[in-house]
Every structure is written in structure tokens, then in C-alpha cells.
Amino acid sequence: QSFGFEMITVPMTPTGPDMDLVEQLVKDPAVKGMWCVPKYSNPDGIIYSDETVHRIANMKPAAKDFMLMWDNAYCVHEFDGDFVPFEDILTLCREAGNPDMVFEFASTSKITFPGAGISVMACSEANQAYMQKLMGIQMISYDKVNELRHVLYLKDKETTLALMKKHAQVLAP
């Protein structure tokens, strides 16, 4: 809102955002984007269904500069049970003819240390070229020592998921 955006609240269903409403809203060229937390979405912990993810990827927004911000903040946060995989939004958007519509984000800040984690962004090659221009003037270098700490500590998917189980033991009532 600080940037002049009017935020539109879309009700959640057990399978994700109300896609009938979303599909109506994106017909308006004034609607410029959508922010999604597809896994364990706050406050209810909803995981978007495959059908919902497919519908999002296949949207045809009226705004040519529409951006889908895919905030994968909780991608490995299985405290109970097994890892819950879900559809790859980048591939689905590309297959739907929307390769430049989506930016996917994640970080380790809710895994290792809040505010000191490392972040990742995934997007199309065209969006990557654009973002590299923007980021190139904003930073001299990444914190390579912190990146190394994370690589050595987290190692791989299995180690990371095991760490999340340890977090669950601490956080459980």
C-alpha cells in the first residue's frame, strides 16, 4: 500500500484461494499481481491443491505486466509426517504460455536463523536478466561466508527435513 497498490483480499478455501474469484479479478487490467504462499499459508496452514496450482499457472490476466509472486516460505516445514511435495509453478507457467508471469521466492530464515538466512529466487530467463540488472546496482557482493555456513549445515534435502523435525520437537506443546 505504501507504493500505491490497493490490496484485494481473496477468501481462502480448503484448497487455496477462491479461484473463481481470482479468475474474475484478473480480467481487470488494473489488477497487476497476486501474492501466494502455496504451502502452509497463514493463518490456516492451507496447502494449495494441484488443481489450484494448475489454475493459477493457466490464468490469462488482462494486465500484460501481471506478476505472480510465489512465496514458498514454508517449502520444507513438515513438522509432523512426511514431506509434502507440490507442483512446480515455474514449469506449469511455462507450459501454460506464461513463463514470465511468475517469480518464486524462498529462504532459510525460518529454518536456520531469522534475518540471517539465505534467500533464493527462481524465474524465467527473461526475468532473471531483468533482476540481475536491478540487483547489480544494489549490492557489491553476496555474503559468501553465510552461504557456505548454510551449505555445510543444511547439506541436502534429507538433512534439512531432519532439522525441521528437531524444530518440531522444540516447538510442540
Question: What residue ranges belong to the model's regions?
Answer:
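Short glycine/proline-rich turn/loop motifs
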Residues: 35-41, 158-159
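Active-site proximal loops enriched in glycine and acidic residues that flank catalytic Cys/His/Asp
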Residues: 11, 38, 72, 106, ...
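PLP-dependent aspartate aminotransferase-fold enzymes
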Residues: 1-37, 54
